[in-house]
A protein has these predicted regions:
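ATP/NTP-dependent adenylation/nucleotidyl-transfer catalytic domains that generate, transfer
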Residues: 1-200
Length: 200
């Protein structure tokens, strides 16, 4: 099983579940930082992978996302109806979705194929219910083990995994206290912004 490991609670709980079920040798965790990802979440991701004993790699996405954006905005589109060429523009929201899709549809899906297995969807029920997700991005994957859990249940499951299942701190304490954030823009930092949702 291949899992995108961001340094947040959702992907960490998903990773711990699959390591418990499949064993660490059958789990590949990948951190995919962009220029918006904090050193803190990148460190938490690596600490989590190390504690779980799983396979781990880091594949940055900034260059590929910028390349995609340039292709989309600089390639002329011809209107045969209006007999003219035009070009598209990319809003900040579209660029956020490009990052999510690059992670899910390119990196994680490609790694899963090469690793010889499936990949997971790390979305929780809170995000799915309000539509805080990206098609072909963070909501793609063969299985969604926390898809029917509200965000506060994900935190509770994380504590349970530490205390009862692994009986040690496999999920770092910082993962329970850091501000939840997709880290897709400068407004979504774990220090000041975070997700646009208020989780109970």
């Amino acid at each position: 099983m291949t899992i995108g490991l961001s340094g947040g609670i959702d992907s960490a709980v998903t990773a711990a579940l699959f390591v418990d079920i499949l064993g660490p040798d059958n789990v590949l965790l990948v951190n995919m930082p962009s220029c918006y990802n904090s050193p803190m979440t990148q460190t938490i991701a690596e600490q989590t992978a190390q504690s779980l004993g799983a396979n781990y790699t880091v594949i940055p996405i900034t260059e590929s996302c910028l390349h995609t954006s340039e292709q989309l905005t600089q390639t002329p589109i011809h209107s045969y109806h209006q007999h003219r060429d035009f070009q598209l523009t990319i809003s900040p929201l579209i660029y956020e979705n490009i990052q999510s899709r690059d992670r899910g549809s390119r990196v994680v899906a490609g790694l899963a194929a090469a690793f010889g297995g499936a990949f997971s969807c790390n979305s929780n029920k809170t995000e799915l219910t309000v539509g805080y997700a990206t098609f072909y991005g963070d909501i793609c994957g063969a299985l969604a083990p926390i898809g029917d859990l509200w965000k506060h249940h994900v935190y509770e499951l994380g504590r349970y995994l530490n205390d009862k299942v692994f009986q040690r701190q496999v999920l770092p304490e910082a993962i329970f206290t850091i501000r939840p954030s997709a880290e897709l823009s400068s407004e979504q930092t774990v220090g000041t912004g975070g997700d646009p949702l208020v989780y109970p």
